[in-house]
């Protein structure tokens, strides 16, 4: 493998599981940073803000700051500013309040100061864009049906990702991609995807680090949206056998990863770091 100057890393299922560090992940990231490689944590997580994610990770011992983290919401905000400036947007998302990462996005259901208004007040508002984030309790029938109605009235459909599921301590859990398929079919509208696997997401990560695609490596547990999508963008892909990894998904994938390792703890050796590593990257 040619020498790399930067590493893009998915968080959930690669560094952590249910926000708890996976074995060896903290030490591996410290070693990578200590070797002087650039690091960007790239995640489709929509349940937490960048600041919240950074707080959890640093509390667990990971050497990261909020500036190291690129999330689907932050990329979505940039996408909307470029393609839908000033649009009135309805957000369908579960988890923490992520408005601080949606800088410049005008959301229904909030006044000019950002305070909550009547949660049902946006039903009859002319919505320009429906934004689909991550699944959870907020993905109830009423919320989905309201989004369906807004799409029927001409709103654009923008989704932060297409993830069908993610893994927690309780096993695989449904994610918003499963519901997005239904919205697309019912409304006869194809979603514009802003997070992984969109090329724009990886381009934003490379720009954030100031490196070319050939100088970077992407590590993920989702073969299609993390690894193969990165490879299409010219980035070397590494699949880990943790998180949502399933052998059957690996076998049925549309392509092959450049590299497969058991876990993120194996990455320093793959990069040629440490005493037990190869003398040169192959």
How does the language model describe each region?
Residues 1-11, 16-37, 46-70, 77-282:
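Asp-based, Mg2+/Mn2+-dependent phosphohydrolase catalytic module
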Residues 40:
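Conserved glycine-rich Rossmann-like NAD(P)H-binding loop of the short-chain dehydrogenase/reductase
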């Amino acid at each position: 493998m040619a020498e790399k100057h930067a590493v893009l890393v998915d968080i959930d299922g690669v560094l952590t599981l249910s926000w708890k560090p996976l074995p060896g992940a903290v030490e591996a990231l410290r070693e990578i940073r200590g070797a002087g490689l650039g690091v960007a944590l790239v995640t489709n997580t929509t349940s937490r803000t960048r600041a919240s994610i950074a707080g959890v990770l640093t509390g667990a011992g990971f050497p990261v700051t909020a500036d190291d983290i690129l999330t689907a919401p932050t990329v979505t905000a940039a996408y909307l500013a470029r393609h839908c400036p000033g649009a009135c947007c309805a957000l369908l998302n579960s988890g923490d309040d992520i408005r601080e990462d949606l800088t410049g996005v005008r959301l229904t259901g909030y006044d000019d100061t950002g305070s909550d208004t009547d949660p049902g007040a946006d039903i009859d508002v002319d919505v320009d864009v429906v934004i689909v984030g991550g699944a959870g309790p907020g993905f109830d029938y009423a919320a989905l049906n309201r989004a369906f109605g807004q799409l029927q009235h001409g709103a654009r459909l923008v989704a932060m990702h297409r993830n069908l599921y993610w893994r927690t301590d309780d096993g695989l859990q449904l994610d918003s991609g499963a519901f997005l398929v239904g919205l697309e079919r019912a409304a006869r509208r194809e979603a514009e995807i802003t997070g992984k696997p969109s090329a724009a997401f990886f381009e934003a990560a490379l720009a954030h680090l100031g490196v070319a695609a050939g100088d970077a490596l992407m590590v993920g547990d989702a073969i299609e949206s993390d690894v193969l999508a990165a490879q299409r963008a010219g980035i070397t892909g590494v699949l880990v056998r943790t998180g949502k990894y399933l052998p059957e998904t690996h076998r049925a994938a549309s392509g092959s990863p450049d590299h497969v390792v058991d876990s993120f703890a194996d990455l320093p050796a793959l990069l040629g770091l440490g005493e037990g590593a190869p003398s040169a990257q192959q």
